[in-house]
Structure formats: structure tokens, C-alpha cells
Amino acid sequence: VEAGASISSMPSSEIYTGMQTGVLDAANTSSASFVSYRLFEQAKCLTAPGENALWFMYEPVLVSKRVFDGLTEEQQKAILAAGEKAEVYFNEEVRKGDQVMIDTYKKAGVEVVEMSKEDYDAWLELAKASSYKNFAANVPGGDKLIEKALAVK
């Protein structure tokens, strides 16, 4: 609220109606969902992913420590090597999906912009003074989680 907005959480499948009815003024979801749910029909502007993006979709493959520790060293190495190979592939595919989204929105007449470094820095300062501060105060270990999130490059 201090930043002039409030958060509303809903499934991506409901964002279209939320924007259509005025419940939402903006939304954040995956590039694929922005296209598949035809959100370009409700949006006037899209902030495209780029160097100064505010978020990224992190979709790891998870294995419990108990299971991983139960594997042989050779199996562990194979899984880690496959993960590294998959990371390269998925990063390339994500960029392709981002471009499909950008092209789709431009074709629909939506203004597509990228956040500048100056805009990002201003946003970050506002976030630190409002939502980050609130998160750190109300979530156990929240300050450490924010530090870890900001360390991701």
C-alpha cells in the first residue's frame, strides 16, 4: 500500500477476468500464461523481460536429500550433469518464449517496454522501503530470504 498498490493473489487462469472487471490493474505470471490466457486483450502495456526484469520463473527439479544421498556417486554425478545440461536448454527456451510473448503483444497493439536501469533502481528503493521492510518484519527469517533473492543474478 505504501507504494501505491496492493497485492491480490489469484490463479493465472483468473487474471483475464480480474483485469476485465477492474479487480486487477496489473498482473505477473509466466510468459507462456501471458500468451495462452490472451491477457493481451486486456493489457495496455507490457513490461518485457530483460536485463532489468523484476522477476524470473524459477522451476527447479527437486530431489530430497535422503533420496539423493542414497544414490551412488556415479548416479549423483549423472543427475547433476543432466541438470546443468537442462539448465542451458531451458534458459534458451525461456528466451524464445519471452520473444513469442513480446511479438504477440506487439501484434495485438499493446505497448511493449523494457524497464531501464534507472527505473529498476527506483523500484528497488521503493520496494526496500515498503514491501521488503514489511516482509522482513512479518516473516521469520524474511530479511535473509530477501538477501538471498537479491543475490540471484
Predicted features, each with a name:
Residues 1-153:
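N-terminal secretory/targeting leader peptides
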